[in-house]
Amino acid sequence: MVEELSVLRRVDWGANFGWPYFEGNTRKNGGEPENLVFPVYDYGHDVGVAVMAGYPCRDCGIPKLDGAILFGDMSGPIWAIGSDGVSRLDAERVDILTGWAQGPDKSLYALAYNGIFKVVER
C-alpha cells in the first residue's frame, strides 16, 4: 500500500486518478483508460501511514519554500514539494499531524495532536 499526493488543477475536474488501475504510481490492474492523472509523489507504508494534504507556501516568510507545497504524514514526517522536487524538511516530528493553517502574518503552521507548530527557517 502507498500514500500519494496528487494535484488537482481546475482543468482536471472529473479527472481519473488511476484507481483501481494504479495505487500511487504502481500498476495494480491492466486495461486502464487514457488520460489518467498520476500523483506528484507517493511513498510506502514503511515511510508513513496517512498523507496529510498539502498547503501552498506563498510569501510565507521563507524564501526557499516560496511556491512549494508543504505536506506531511500523520506519523510525523513533513516534506516540501517544489519545482526542484521533493525534500524532507529538517523538522521536529509532530505527534499525529492533522492539518495546516496560515496565520494573519502569512506564516504557516502545522497542526498536530501535541500542539501547533510555526514553520520557520533554520
Question: What are these model-derived regions, one by one?
Answer:
Residues 1-87, 105, 117-122:
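Beta-propeller domain segments
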Residues 108-111:
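Short, exposed beta-strand-loop hairpins at the edges of beta-sheets
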Residues 85-104:
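Conserved blade-ending motifs and adjacent loop-strand segments that build the rim/top face
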